[in-house]
C-alpha cells in the first residue's frame, strides 16, 4: 500500500533554495513510492515569475503542490496569521488523505507537525536546518531587550526541545550540529535518531566535464578576465557573510598576479562596489555579476579560487553552505574560515582549499593565499562522497523506510 507524506515548508518552492533543497529530494522520494502533498509559502512576486514552472514540475512528478502565500507584515503577527491560515487546509487534507508522515522543514512548520503527531499519531520528521532560534538573535532579527522578542525567544526554545524530544526523526545539516544536540542530554534524543544530511548538489548540473572549455574561454574573454587571477564569491551576502573580511583577504594577494574579485550575486552591485572603495580596492579589480542559477556552473569555472567567510557564531555550528558543495563539485579551491559547521573539516579532509582561523565572530585571522596542498580530484571526490544529491535522497529514504516500514 502506497504511503502518504505531507511536506511542510515555510520557504517557497519558487525560491531557488526551494527548488534545489526541497523539490529535488521530494522528486527522488516520490520515485521510491511515497505519495507527496507539499505545502509551501510563496512570495507573491516570485510566484508570478516561477509559479507556472513549479506547477509543471510537480505535475510531471505526481506531487500534489498546495501553495499558500507568505505574509510579510506586520512582523511576528504575520507568521501567526500564516499558521492560522495553514491549519484548516491541513485538516481538510488529513481527512481525505490520511497521511502516514509529516516532514517539517525548520521550526515554524514544526509547530504544525508536532500538533499533527499529537492529534493523529502521524510520524513526525523535524528537519531542523540549523539552530533557527539562535540565528534570529545572532542575526539581529530578534532583539532580546524587547519583552516581545524575549517572550518569542523563550517560547521557541521551549518548542525546540519539544520538537527534538517528540519527533520520530531529526535531520541536522552538520555533524557539529548533531554533536551539539547530543550534548544537551534531552529525553529521547539519541545519535541514532539524528541523521546528518548536508545541503547537497546535483552533480549532473555541477559537472565541469559537461561544460565546453571553449565556451568558458569565450566568457572569460568577454568579461576581460584573461591573464588575471580570479578570486570568486557566489551567492547573497546578507547578515552572515563577512564581506569586509573577504575584501581584506583579497587585498593580501600579490598584485603581480593581477587579481580580480568576481562576485556572482543578486545583491545590489553598487553597495558592494562602495564597500570595495572603502577598502581601497580599485574599481577595475572588482566585478559584480547577476547570473541566472542555470548559468552558475559555467561561471564558477571562471574562478581560480573562491572565498567565503561566515560569522563563526554558535548557530553556525549547524550551517552547511550550498556554495561549498557546488565549488568542490566543480573542482574550484575553496578558502573558508573555521568554526562554521563541518566546512573546515571537509576542506582539510579532501585537500579542497585553505582554512583560516576565526579570531572571533566578526574577524578572520587572514594569512596569505596558499593552495600548494590543493588537490582538484580529491576535492571533486569529496563532493561526490559528502554532497551528492543522490546520496542525500538515499539518506532521506533510510529515514522514511525506518519510520514507515517498521518491523512490528
Place the predicted regions along the sequence by residue:
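Conserved donor-binding/catalytic core segment of Leloir-type glycosyltransferases
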Residues: 6-8, 225-241, 247-250
